[in-house]
């Protein structure tokens, strides 16, 4: 089911709880919502649809991938970039890594460790930030600021 996008920074700044197999429907709703917004969005976290669970979905060059409880276990190749977000207006500067290794569970709750690079790595980092409650303020453009201070 396609869900409405959450824009409330107070909700988005809350750290999400670990997902369980009971959250499979939320993952499907997240995927449906991502697909419905394919023209303006390449990734989403569950809190963007109002569910504070550690679930992300990404569009990796036309192939959709859902991750439960994703965690970056290694990273290298730091760079600065600007990113937009479906939940927030405008673009913000941020620091990302060119290559990351992520530990996550798939839809069968089998643990996976996989490396990602370039734009796909950037998408995953952005969505994991959502899971961690890292939400840049729309009016703040400096690197490292979050909406926690609101």
Model-derived regions, located:
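Positively charged
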Residues: 1-142
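Positively charged, low-complexity/disordered segments
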Residues: 140, 144-150
């Amino acid at each position: 089911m396609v869900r409405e996008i959450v824009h409330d920074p107070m909700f988005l700044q809350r750290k999400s709880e670990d997902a369980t197999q009971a959250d499979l429907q939320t993952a499907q709703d997240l995927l449906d919502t991502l697909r419905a917004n394919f023209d303006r969005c390449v990734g989403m976290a569950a809190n963007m649809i109002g569910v504070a669970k550690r679930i992300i979905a990404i569009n990796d060059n036309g192939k959709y991938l859902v991750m439960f409880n994703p965690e970056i276990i290694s990273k290298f190749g730091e760079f600065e970039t600007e990113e937009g977000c479906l939940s927030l207006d405008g673009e913000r500067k941020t620091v990302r890594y060119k290559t990351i290794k992520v530990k996550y569970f798939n839809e069968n709750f089998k643990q996976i460790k996989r490396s990602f690079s370039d734009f796909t790595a950037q998408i995953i980092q952005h969505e994991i930030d959502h899971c961690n409650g890292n939400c840049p303020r729309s009016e703040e453009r400096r690197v490292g600021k979050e909406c926690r201070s609101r």
